[in-house]
């Protein structure tokens, strides 16, 4: 399975036009922004870099997340994200022609950190374990 990351175009119909070739090839598109289950809860801001937001998202989805965050504050967000990743993996396993997933993230810029990279890593882990 190939997992691509592309920028989500917020204009109505923008993604469809930009990624028509991928759509024709049967790619599965997954939105990774807020307010969806895969949206990064760590917001980039004055004192919070993009890299730190990605690093914290990686910690959040990791096994040792409770060492880094108060469990009662992040459990819901973490569970939603991991469940969504499992759902996507299940869809891929059920559909033998689903060989390409496109993660659409509003913040994605090639060469810069993006939490969709963490989602790709987790998806590949889940799909590998299922083999």
Regions found by a protein language model. Give the residues of each.
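Residues lining hydrophobic/aromatic ligand-binding pockets adjacent to catalytic sites
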Residues: 1-131
